[in-house]
């Protein structure tokens, strides 16, 4: 995982050079300003476009699965609800490298209790996956989850609409992936994410898969610059 993070960081620096070059256009053809070739820029643009499609697909799947989760909760099947909870979340966790661009939707869908209370000084208004998680594991029942499940579905629908307008850049993808892998290695590994269900390993796997998707998209450009990476 460390090697993956280092590799992604190297491409992030390359993408940063591209952004810097575009902001420092000069008429002097001999300028020392670093910039990408048209071919490399096209590769970056293609990778960015494909990744956005990937995220849209993940959020589509998240919505479908969460609607089914809502039905399971409504039926009162506690065992099934606990079984599918971590599996459903994986689609969201694969998209987390660009969660920064989700804005308030990320807060509504994936905010942990400790973070919510830290910002709002109370639990009032707290919702999302982790609100349902606490009821399922701490109270060991599906009762009381229905309203949160309905709100969660609506919040994911809102996110789905938002994704279509989000500007995804190579810098956002790459720095987001590196930051996420670092978070997994230094913070999430303690179990802080799924504090009630202890299903963190599913999150780790999905986070790494999301970062690997970014790596795969940029791999041709990485190998072109340094085949040893």
Per-region residue spans from a language model:
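Generic cytosolic/nucleocytoplasmic N-terminal low-complexity/intrinsically disordered segments
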Residues: 1-2, 22-23, 27, 88
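Residues in flexible loops and secondary-structure boundaries
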Residues: 9-12, 22-25, 117, 140
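Bacterial lipoprotein signal-peptidase II cleavage site
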Residues: 15-32
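Mature extracytoplasmic or organellar-lumen-exposed domains after removal of signal/transit peptides
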Residues: 31-229
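Sec-dependent bacterial lipoprotein signal peptides
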Residues: 1-15
């Amino acid at each position: 995982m460390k090697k993956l993070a280092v590799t992604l960081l190297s491409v992030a620096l390359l993408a940063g050079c591209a952004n810097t070059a575009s902001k420092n256009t000069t008429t002097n053809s001999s300028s020392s300003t670093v910039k990408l070739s048209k071919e490399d820029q096209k590769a970056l643009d293609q990778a960015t476009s494909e990744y956005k499609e990937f995220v849209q697909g993940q959020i589509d799947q998240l919505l479908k699965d969460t609607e089914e989760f809502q039905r399971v909760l409504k039926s009162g099947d506690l065992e099934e609800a606990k079984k599918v909870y971590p599996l459903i979340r994986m689609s969201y966790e694969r998209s987390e490298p660009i969660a920064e661009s989700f804005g308030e939707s990320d807060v509504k869908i994936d905010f942990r209790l400790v973070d919510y209370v830290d910002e709002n000084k109370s639990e009032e208004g707290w919702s999302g996956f982790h609100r349902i998680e606490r009821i399922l594991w701490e109270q060991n029942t599906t009762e009381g989850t229905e309203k949160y499940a309905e709100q969660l579905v609506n919040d994911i629908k809102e996110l789905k609409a938002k994704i279509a307008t989000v500007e995804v850049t190579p810098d956002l993808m790459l720095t987001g992936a590196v930051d996420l892998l670092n978070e997994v290695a230094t913070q999430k590994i303690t179990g802080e994410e799924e504090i009630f269900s202890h299903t963190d390993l599913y999150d780790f796997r999905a986070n790494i898969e999301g970062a690997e998707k970014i790596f795969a998209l940029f791999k041709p450009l990485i190998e072109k610059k340094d085949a040893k990476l």
